[in-house]
Amino acid sequence: MTIPNLTTFGFDSEHQAAYDMAYRYASEELYPLCEKMDNDEWFPEEHYRAMSKEGLLGITVPSEYGGSGLNVLFQCFVCEAISYWNHTLAASFLASDNLCLDNLVRNANDLQKHQYCPKFCEGTYIGALGMTEPGAGSDALGSMATTAAQKGDEYILNGRKLFITNGPVADVLLVYAKTDKEKNKHGISAFIVEKNFEGFSVAQKLDKM
């Protein structure tokens, strides 16, 4: 097995160590899953917990919330290593660990971080980002029709999302919705939506190439 030498491109030994670990794990544990995932449209949810034990989840999450406290560059190397052996699971990893979890780390309040981040880091939660909608083109934010209306201390979301990576398996989604239509794409807020929230449902999986 020949593992790419990152130091050739100016990266340091810590980056190389992270890449090596993810590369070896993916080649041994994730590559054998590819055929079943592609042929049977099967998703190995249990492998998220296994990936957590290897330190592959919550890379950018501060240690106080259960993560590794590293930067997004380490996350990129881990994703690339996984993608070399199982590109489907790499896309899932990116949607959960970066688009959803890293977004929470950057923008959620402290209470929300303590509530959600540890479960992502231990592989109990799989995440997704709910942005794209039916009929949306390149202007996914400007054309967004999903709304969020405040009712007392809560917000009521109304709308549909489509082509959401991890959508059928996500435990928690970060959903974008318009809270101020007059501001167009500048009037969008992000909401944490759990799969068991009242009124939330997931449609059928879409066949893919």
Name the predicted role of every residue range.
Residues 136-140, 155:
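Hydrophobic, small-residue-rich alpha-helical packing segments that form membrane-like cores
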Residues 53-124, 165-172:
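Internal helix-loop-helix
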Residues 15, 26, 55, 62, ...:
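Buried hydrophobic positions in well-ordered alpha/beta secondary-structure cores of metabolic enzymes
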Residues 1-17, 148:
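Intrinsic disorder at enzyme termini
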Residues 32-54:
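Short secondary-structure junction/hinge motifs that connect adjacent elements
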